[in-house]
């Protein structure tokens, strides 16, 4: 793709969480010069900006030396279990109400598959990722976001874990907290419910 270590990369997706997940993955892998197109193609098109349909030209291959991963952005299964047992962390579930309540394991509108068990990580607070967005999939204002997170106990100094089903929606919460509100202790559990709901012996709340 012609991307080097210093190339600026702008992501968008449809739905928007796929663009955010790509942003998060690049940042986690040490590529810092990345950005997110707020509102994505939906907003771009609504504003009358140009679109193309032709196939882009191929870019010459470039060397890419991997950087150190930023492990401060990610939390693993055993660490989540420790956080549940220890208490004190704010765990935010970005899934739909149906998934959070245990009525489904899959997202609305799709197959109800992906995990053996339904429910949520014990103590998790429900904050559907879509609550952070306007109708055109732009992030709400910082004041609105701050109020939403504070209502769910996510104070600026809190240790926060975000998760969903496959971690795409969880990265939307992470982006809002870290990039728009400046929170410094936020980690994505990227195993999310696809891992937790298939594990043997971990606690599940419904």
Region locations from a protein language model:
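Positively charged, proline/Ser/Thr-rich regional signature most characteristic
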Residues: 1-6, 81-152, 156, 202-206
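Short cysteine clusters
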Residues: 164
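Short Gly/Pro-enriched loop/turn and capping motifs at secondary-structure junctions
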Residues: 131-134, 168-170, 194
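Conserved beta-strand elements of the Class I
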Residues: 10, 90-92, 161
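Extended hydrophobic/aromatic segments used for targeting, binding, or gating
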Residues: 184-206
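Thiolate-centered catalytic microenvironments shared by cysteine-dependent enzyme domains
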Residues: 1-86, 103-104, 119, 169-192
């Amino acid at each position: 793709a012609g991307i080097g270590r210093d190339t600026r990369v702008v992501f968008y997706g449809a739905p928007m969480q796929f663009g955010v997940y790509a942003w998060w993955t690049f940042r986690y892998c040490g590529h810092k010069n990345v950005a997110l197109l707020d509102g994505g193609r939906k907003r771009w098109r609504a504003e009358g900006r140009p679109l193309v349909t032709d196939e882009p030209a191929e870019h010459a291959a470039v060397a890419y030396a991997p950087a150190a991963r930023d492990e401060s952005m990610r939390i693993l299964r055993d660490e989540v279990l420790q956080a549940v047992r220890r208490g004190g962390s704010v765990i935010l579930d970005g899934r739909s109400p149906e998934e959070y309540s245990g009525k489904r394991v899959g997202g609305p509108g799709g197959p109800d598959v992906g995990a053996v068990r339904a429910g949520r990580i014990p103590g998790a607070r429900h904050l559907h990722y879509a609550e952070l967005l306007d109708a055109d999939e732009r992030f709400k204002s910082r004041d609105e976001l701050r109020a939403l997170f504070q209502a769910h106990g996510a104070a600026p100094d809190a240790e926060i874990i975000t998760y969903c089903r496959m971690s795409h929606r969880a990265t939307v919460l992470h982006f809002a907290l870290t990039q728009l509100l400046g929170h410094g202790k936020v980690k994505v559990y990227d195993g999310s419910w696809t891992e937790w709901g298939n594990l043997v012996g971990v606690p599940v709340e419904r």
